[in-house]
Every structure is written in C-alpha cells, then in structure tokens.
Regions:
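OB-fold ssDNA-binding interfaces and closely related basic DNA-contact patches used
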Residues: 1-151, 207-215, 221, 241-247
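Short linear regulatory motifs embedded in intrinsically disordered, acidic Ser/Thr-rich regions
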Residues: 232-241
Length: 247
C-alpha cells in the first residue's frame, strides 16, 4: 500500500507531465515575464494568432476553455453554458527567459532583491512559450503590440516585459519594451521553424470536449483568467513603482 510520500510523488509526476504538454504562460497577480517574441507580426505568421475563447466551470469542479470556430462563430465544445460570451484574445510564441513572482510558490524559485530592497522570486524558464493576452478595452493591449511592431519593424527585434496586476474584475496588464538581453540560443534557433502553429496548438488543447479541461497549476501551465476581467486604464509605459523594479 502506498504511503503519503509515494502518493505525493505520484501526484507531482502527473502534474509535471500535464504541465510539459502545455506551452502557455498564464500570469497571476504581481507576476511579470521577460520575453523575446518569436512571432514577427508579418502577414500569415503562424506564430501569432487572434482567438475567441470561452472560459466556464466544468461539471464536477474546475474550469474549461473552449475555442470558437472562426467559420461558424460557435464554440468547438458542445457543453458551453447558455448566455456565456467568449473573450477576445491574441496569442504568440516567444522565447521566455524568466518569470518574476512576488510570492514563492515553489522551493526551486530563486529569491532576488531589487536595488530598492524589494524581494521577489525568479523562475528560470529559458524556453519557447505561448503568451496569451486579452485585446483589451478598445483593443488597448493589442494596440500596444502594434505600436511596438511599428517601432521595431518586427516583433522579434526586442525584449518585452509583460506584467499582470490584480485579479478577477480588477485585472490589468502592462506591456513595455525593456533593455534586457533575452536571445534565443544559437543552438536552438532551428526549433523556431518546428514550433506548432498557434492556431493548431489551440485547436489541440481547446478545440473539443475532451481537450479543454483546465486546472489551476503553476504560472507556466495554466491559471484561468475571467472573461470579464478589467482591461482598461493602463497606459503603455506604466509609472507604478513595481514596474520600475529591476530584478
């Protein structure tokens, strides 16, 4: 008969296996991620996609996501509750160096201190991940990305910091270019061509009744963002003290 330790180890292995299949980054309150987009922003770029996604409670607890078919404008899952509205999102591949957390939720995260003395916890990623964000009120966040494309000429020419503040109805995001070195290692540049197109990834994850189950795990796996989150009143370059912290 398995003891507590064996059961705990088994559950962790199962959770890590599920996490390895997922490639999205979902930020929690206070998290910030540093990344270099792999997407270029050019027409027909498979590494950047527009999505409509339902998020709703599943039977028996937990959450589910269901992708909207762009041809029929209907969810690809038949159990979406009546009266639900999908969230308008965009997703892109990026090379992520690290995620900075304001709370330590894992022992292997490194404690770091900013010049002002603020503590945070660094999660090393150094891998390709998908970052998904809402378009925002009046396409606010999307327009931030477009502005950066106009400045750089291509999205993959620089490094972005994406930060989430708040939760639920009080959730806001900020996106800003930063002078930080985040480069795809020369030995991994060939992997970019092999990345699964964003749309295909989302269809495989959230395109049917059996593929859309969600559980709340660590930031590089999944956390549900409410469909009615607050997305207004955040400028391109924020002046919040937390945004200015250099870790």
């Amino acid at each position: 008969m398995a003891g507590l330790s064996s059961i705990n180890n088994r559950q962790r292995e199962m959770s890590e296996a599920r996490g390895a299949e997922r490639k999205e980054i979902w930020l929690r309150d206070g998290d910030q991620v540093f990344l270099r987009p792999v997407a270029t922003g050019e027409d027909d770029d498979p590494n950047l996609e527009e999505l409509y996604l339902y998020t709703y409670e599943a039977e028996g607890g937990g959450w589910k996501n269901a992708l909207v078919d762009p041809d029929t404008h209907k969810p690809m899952s038949d159990d979406v509750p009546e009266g639900k509205s999908p969230s308008h999102k965009f997703a892109m591949w990026a090379y992520v160096s690290e995620v900075i957390h304001n709370q330590q939720r894992r022992d292997d995260w490194e404690e770091v201190v900013s010049p002002s003395g603020k503590k945070a916890y660094r999660e090393e990623v150094n891998d390709f991940r998908i970052i998904t964000l809402p378009f925002g009120r009046g396409n606010q966040y999307w327009n931030m990305l477009v502005d950066q494309y106009d400045d750089w000429g291509s999205l993959n020419k620089g490094v972005l910091r994406v930060k989430r503040t708040g939760a639920g109805l009080d959730t806001v995001y900020s996106l800003s270019p930063v002078a930080r070195k985040v480069d795809v290692p020369s030995g991994r540049e060939g992997e970019i061509e092999a990345l699964q197109p964003i749309w295909d990834y989302y269809v495989s994850r959230y395109g049917g009744n059996d593929s859309s189950e969600e559980t709340e795990t660590e930031v590089i796996t999944a956390t549900v963002t409410p469909t009615n989150e607050k997305v207004e009143d955040m400028s391109w370059n924020t002046s919040d003290e937390d945004d200015d912290e250099d870790f």
